[in-house]
């Protein structure tokens, strides 16, 4: 096919995505590399694509064509300016397209000898959101990157000084955090805070502690609010209030700072916690509610609701069941019998503790007792 025929075919495939997605995706997957080889980036830029889905689907072709021309910096620029928010995989309908975008971004940055460590964070998020193709692409990219750098496993701890031990825990906390093991990450960051006398290192650990706690749905932040942690307390406030709009505003207005600290994509993961908190609040208020109503209340795509509700149930944040597009909240009501059993158990425990106390209870002094002891 010549360029004109390829463009006509691509436009037809893209327009079919909204009406007959299965057939359109089959055609796209079979022909995408043909489009890349035969269509110039300038031609693609001139296309008038109406929907966001069509535009996202066109980007892999644009990036692929640029990669063939070895315009690596331009690929990086396009992704950073237009596609960063999509790489986290929030919309699973974009899974295949995002996977291709990540592949070309990784290859471009690799050719420019640039850092690709953000892929660790993207891997965790896309795993959580069920983006199978993107996860497959990122996994292979990371394997390529690690093997290329001769990194095959974690480094054993053989550090003896306190200051270096603090830094070692800080670095290991970052590894655990990007992998999604927030419990282990918190242990490392807490250890770093305790051992370190370096103010910058402690501040970096505190920022990551807050993010890990929020990602674990734990809002008992152990630090006072101060200017250096302002962004993180704003994010915490948005998550607790389930305010997705405020969360996204805070994230985007502080994007440069978060990117410079390598925390933008980690903080971006909190979007799911915002929605989870919203679902939790809905489960308290409503005993029965449809997916469409949940989507309307939270301002999200109705197609994503079922997955998110089931995920929230699996995490144990809410109790309920789903059937035929309806969520039914299940509340645990304590019966009078349960309360009675609880009181009985408390009394038995108190008696047991008293019986096993090391020293007898001290009784108040009185004349009769003193006289009795004196007479003995």
Curated annotation (Swiss-Prot):
Localization, UniProt: Cytoplasm; Nucleus
Signal sequence coordinates: none
Nucleus keyword on record: yes
PCI domain boundaries: 159-336
Keyword Nucleus on entry: yes
Chief localization: cytoplasm
Cellular component terms per the entry's GO annotation: COP9 signalosome; cytoplasm; proteasome complex
InterPro entries: CSN3 (IPR050756), PCI_dom (IPR000717), WH_DNA-bd_sf (IPR036390)
SUPFAM superfamilies linked to this entry: Winged helix' DNA-binding domain (SSF46785)
PROSITE patterns: PCI
A biological process from GO: ubiquitin-dependent protein catabolic process
Top-level taxon: Eukaryota
Keywords tagged on the record: Cytoplasm, Nucleus, Proteasome
Described function: Acts as a regulatory subunit of the 26S proteasome which degrades poly-ubiquitinated proteins in the cytoplasm and in the nucleus. It is essential for the regulated turnover of proteins and for the removal of misfolded proteins. The proteasome is a multicatalytic proteinase complex that is characterized by its ability to cleave peptides with Arg, Phe, Tyr, Leu, and Glu adjacent to the leaving group at neutral or slightly basic pH.
PANTHER family recorded: 26S PROTEASOME NON-ATPASE REGULATORY SUBUNIT 3/COP9 SIGNALOSOME COMPLEX SUBUNIT 3 (PTHR10758), COP9 SIGNALOSOME COMPLEX SUBUNIT 3 (PTHR10758:SF1)
Quaternary structure, from the entry: The 26S proteasome consists of a 20S proteasome core and two 19S regulatory subunits. The 20S proteasome core is composed of 28 subunits that are arranged in four stacked rings, resulting in a barrel-shaped structure. The two end rings are each formed by seven alpha subunits, and the two central rings are each formed by seven beta subunits. The catalytic chamber with the active sites is on the inside of the barrel.
Assigned protein family: Belongs to the proteasome subunit S3 family.
Record protein name field: 26S proteasome regulatory subunit RPN3
Taxonomic source organism: Encephalitozoon cuniculi (strain GB-M1) (Microsporidian parasite)
Lineage, top ranks: Eukaryota, Fungi, Fungi incertae sedis, Microsporidia, Unikaryonidae
Gene: RPN3
